[in-house]
Amino acid sequence: MSNAPLKIGLGIIGFGTVGQGVWKHLAATRRNMEMRLGVKIELIGVCVRDPDKPRKVKIPRTQILTDPFALVQDPRVNIVCELMGGTTLARDITLHALRLGKSVISANKALICEHGMEIFAAVSQHGGQYFFEASVAGGIPVIKSLREGLVANCFSEIVGIINGTCNYLLSRMEKESLSYETALKDARRLGYVEADESLDLDGVDAYHKAVILAFLAHGKWVPRKNTLVEGIRNVTLEDIRRASDFGCKIKHLAVIHRDFSKGTMTLGVYPALIPLDSILARVDGVHNGISLTGDVVGTTTLVGRGAGQDATASAVIGDIVDAIRALKGAAFKFLTTEDLESYATLGSTARMATLEEILSRFYLRFSLRDKSGVSAEVYRILAEEGISVARVIQYEHAGTQRGTHTLSTYPVSEAAMERAVRKLRKLRSVLEPPLVLRILAPAS
């Protein structure tokens, strides 16, 4: 009887920053992993668009392919790492691999957000495995925490800084008194901004990640039309400074709230004011932080590197280890038919809250013509919508005949604030569109 270790073949599709990081660290740690897992890991090959493109990580030319389906169909490949990005070809490759019963590992949050239901169904139907820890918050094991370590909990709230680019920009603005434009220029130079900048700056990237967390926590796929998605383009250095006057910092957050008594759920991605003494307020730079509030554990906050080659490669390699254990029969299977039925049942217990039902405190900034009676017009509109003001800070701009008002409100509905802002925009005395930010007080 042979005692030869089980051979595990690995194929990587996409050899950009993350793919090269995975190959580099696997090559360095493979022997140690093999001894710990009792297997023989073979790096079968990588698939790229341009084999001749210069790359920092060098691999033998014989291990470079250009046909991803050929790599997936190679009988030696047990685990496919889909690290190419995009949602069209990546979807086709992923489904093809799963239908062959292979394990797929992905860092592709957009793909999961848009096609997760179809991909998860393919897992349950064909017996493959799908792992996606690297899709949310890079080196922070939040997906494994939701699936395993914190599985005993019903989560009333998940609040996270899950886009490192936005956090970097707001941190630089706050710490160095930089304008948004100057901070963004530096972020571009350092390679912190996606090629399609709207993914980071308009909240789309964070929305993709929040949808994944919402499904894992509550069993519900949340469409874009049922969410509040905003970026940070309208946040100014002036707002950063005024936030400190209210005892807060501005952070770009993903917020998932579940009201079990009402059967409602909300998902939002937006810049918000959070108290200076909260844990998330101290998460700066490109780091991520996620606070999860459960009925059993209370509030747990995970902080770490949310992006970058090494942090993401760490998550991918962690998934490779889980895939190997599953192939050996030493780990439980995830996304079985029973799992998906349980998620569907869980999701059916929650409906998305309406704007009238979503309550928040707000920060409101507007500039007024320096003229008698104009403030009264503003506060009349707020009163019409039932908006109670908690605090007001006013300051003048010498020689400009205008003044800026910043105020905080008591809790009021999103719908009421939306109506009030529409009315304020029509006032001739309001010199520029008002800025509205939410004020949160996370349990952390």
What are these regions (language model features)?
Residues 104-105, 389:
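A short hydrophobic/small-residue beta-strand
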Residues 89-100, 109-147:
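Rossmann-fold NAD(P)-binding glycine/threonine-rich loop
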Residues 270-295, 309-310, 383, 388-399:
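Low-complexity, glycine/alanine/valine/leucine- and proline-rich hydrophobic stretches
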